[in-house]
From Swiss-Prot:
Residues 67-165 form the Peptidase A1 domain. Glycans are attached at N57. It comes from the Eukaryota. It comes from Saccharomyces cerevisiae (strain ATCC 204508 / S288c) (Baker's yeast). The lineage of its organism: Eukaryota, Fungi, Dikarya, Ascomycota, Saccharomycotina. GO terms for molecular function: aspartic-type endopeptidase activity. Keywords: Glycoprotein, Signal. Pfam families: Asp (PF00026). Belongs to the peptidase A1 family. This is Yapsin-5. Residues 1-24 form the signal peptide. InterPro entries: PEPTIDASE_A1, Peptidase_aspartic_dom_sf. Transmembrane segments: none annotated.
Length: 165
């Protein structure tokens, strides 16, 4: 249910972006497919993705108390750092505006001209065992100086906390 809400919110944000565009060709379009319909994932066949005997070997970087994996996403490939949270099921691809990403930057001008930044925040329902979760979704869509389009999406989940001194 929560995933549906996030996807619905993302869809609304992307529709808002189309209104901000200056021409008919300045909108963002995402094809939606079932996982089984995707013919090729990188260089692997879909049938091998779910095999339990395969292991992903990658370098894990530890910095500022978090672990990240350096990945390439998109066409042309863009280097991003996937943040691993061993204490939850969340997976985060950091936004280029985060200080950690700037310190690991490869020199790409993600924060160039012609950017649109959309942010929405909502609070989940309170339960008897936990305080409400604050979920923030922000998307930065832009065109850099080489006319390459970038979409940087960040979903942040923060649980309310009480501090005692």
């Amino acid at each position: 249910m929560q995933l549906f809400s996030i996807l619905s919110l993302l869809s609304s944000l992307m529709c808002s972006l189309t209104v901000l565009g200056s021409s008919a060709s300045s909108y963002v379009k995402f094809p939606v497919q079932k996982f089984a319909d995707i013919i090729n994932i990188g260089t692997q066949d879909v049938s091998t993705v779910f095999k339990r005997n395969e292991v992903l070997n990658t370098t894990v970087i530890n910095g500022i108390g978090v672990y990240v994996v350096k990945m390439e996403i998109g066409t042309p490939p863009q280097t991003v750092y996937l943040q691993l949270d061993t204490g939850s099921s969340d997976m985060i691809v950091n936004n280029a505006d985060i200080a950690y990403c700037k310190s690991m930057s490869d020199g790409s001008d993600y924060a160039s001209t012609d950017n649109y930044e959309l942010t929405a925040t909502f609070t989940g329902p309170r339960s008897t065992t936990t305080s409400p979760e604050l979920i923030t979704l922000s998307a930065l869509i832009g065109v850099n100086s080489m006319q390459e389009t970038h979409l940087l999406l960040r979903i942040t989940r923060l649980s309310s906390m009480t501090y005692t001194y």
